[in-house]
Amino acid sequence: MKIKNAEFITSAAKTADYPAGNIPEVALAGRSNVGKSSLLNRLVNRKSLARISSTPGRTRLINFFLVNGLFRLVDLPGYGYAKVSARERQGWRRMVEEYLKTRENLKGVVLLVDSRHPPTVLDVQMYEWLKYQGIPAAVAATKADKISRSKRAQSLKVIREVLNLTAKEPLVFFSAETSEGREEMLEVIGRWVGLSGR
């Protein structure tokens, strides 16, 4: 799938603020600072479409981006950020759950995990929850440029084991720095939104 253009549409905290229409959507989920905004920018080949922060927890709303005028990428607030109040974390969780459970436009979720470390308990909970809800999911192992080739097989093995992935469930090494994994991830997204090969 070739990306010709991408634009920020809106930020939303509740259902009433979601974009109207039946354009298919793919959401990006993961821990704070795992690289969701960087992955989004690399997928659409724009350096600063989604704001990147070195401070975890900066994405506090659900951000919608229109791609090729045909589908939306949706950047969800990260989970697991400790330096906010329990009340605020609970609010983010409710916001994300409401989107994932009620959004009819949603066709799939890319769960980002850091390739350098085993998935966290929260990563496992999120992946199991997506499967329980019947939402198609793929895993992007981010920061792939920071892991040596010799350690990759072990990293993949650990991620598959911890998340209990089958061989058919997509797992892609991804680097926002080198573009590794970009085409594979776009192929997965293209299948979900009905644009495979376009």
From Swiss-Prot:
Name under which the protein is recorded: Probable GTP-binding protein EngB
GO CC entries: cytosol
Stored Gene3D superfamilies: P-loop containing nucleotide triphosphate hydrolases
Positions contributing to GTP binding: 30-37, 57-61, 75-78, 142-145, 174-176
Keywords, in A-Z order: Cell cycle, Cell division, GTP-binding, Magnesium, Metal-binding, Nucleotide-binding, Septation
Gene symbol of the encoding locus: engB
HAMAP family per record: GTPase_EngB
Cofactors, names only: Mg(2+)
SUPFAM superfamilies recorded: P-loop containing nucleoside triphosphate hydrolases (SSF52540)
Domain EngB-type G: 22-195
Pfam families linked to this entry: MMR_HSR1 (PF01926)
Functional description taken from the UniProt entry: Necessary for normal cell division and for the maintenance of normal septation.
Organism listed in the record: Pelotomaculum thermopropionicum (strain DSM 13744 / JCM 10971 / SI)
Record GO biological process: division septum assembly
Positions annotated to bind Mg(2+): 37, 59
GO MF annotations, alphabetized: GTP binding; metal ion binding
